[in-house]
């Protein structure tokens, strides 16, 4: 795996409330992205720094956005021990559709600095 990214395109609930073939594709991933990364690290599939590179600098290289990424990069403070339940209330994204609803995840971005 060279790079890991999401295609964050928030969809309202109404965009998903039709027969499957008629809905817009996609699931909510923005809110669970860090927790799933923490899980990959805890399962020893990635070292922490390796995962950070795969979700930050390497996607910027692939998209030919390295200079912009360096200029506009911020910091994210992650609590890898924070346990939380995925629910419509804890998902901040407009879209609330995820197969992870009701599951307890470990790890969450708790602060961003730009």
Where in the sequence are the language-model features?
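C-terminal cap of metal-dependent C-N hydrolases
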Residues: 19, 73-114
């Amino acid at each position: 795996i060279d790079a890991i990214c999401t295609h964050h395109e928030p969809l309202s609930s109404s965009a998903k409330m039709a027969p499957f073939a008629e809905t817009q594709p996609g699931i909510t991933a923005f809110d669970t992205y860090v927790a799933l990364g923490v899980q990959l690290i805890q399962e020893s599939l990635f070292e922490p720094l390796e995962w950070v590179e795969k979700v930050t600098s390497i996607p910027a290289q692939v998209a030919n956005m390295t200079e912009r990424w360096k200029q506009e990069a911020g910091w994210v403070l992650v609590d890898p021990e924070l346990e939380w339940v995925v629910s419509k209330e804890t998902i901040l994204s407009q879209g609330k559709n995820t197969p992870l609803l009701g599951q307890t995840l470990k790890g969450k971005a708790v602060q961003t600095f730009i």
